[in-house]
Amino acid sequence: KKGNALIQGTAIAGIFRQYLAGERQIKDEPQELKELFGNDHNKTTDSTLSNIYISDAYITTPKVGKRDGVKLELFSKIALDKSKYDYEILYPGQEFEIKIEVIIREKHQKYEQAFKNYLAQILDGLMNSKITIGAKTSRGFGKIKVKTAPTITALDMTKKQDVETWINFDWNTFKPNTTLQNLGTPIQNDQYITIKTDLLIEKTLMI
């Protein structure tokens, strides 16, 4: 209604989960990953509550453009009749903020370090532009990078002072008390392969 661009936190969570899972299907995810994001995929078991919460990301003064698209026949890849459409894009250089909250409940104490490692991997992926957001990412859209280093606050609910901080918590005034290096070790995904080579355009290339 206000004309702001919005990326829903639930959509960002799904992107992060897929990044952490790599090429695995949901049913093959490690148990600690299912516990972190919640599990409601196997109807024969009880659903589990998510332990990670991600804020909606707002771009308050979006610079929006339009691109043309055309729907293709699935197998022949020939353009279908009367199938032209437009889609909106956000131009490069625009900024948004993501807030991530991870809660380690008593029943998940055994997963504490795994949760921290997953969070460290998410932050590492953001800082090194390994994570893309939005549609048509295979065509080069949605690449993001971190403008400023993430700030991290860890609260211990067995300490009175941390409990009071939690009760009166304000994202705008909280003070970081740990670093990414102290948080955990990113769990490396083995599905990423980088190949660098020189190529020759043998025939005409349309760009």
Region spans (language model):
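Small/polar/charged residue-enriched interaction surfaces, especially the RNA/DNA-contacting tracks
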Residues: 1-207
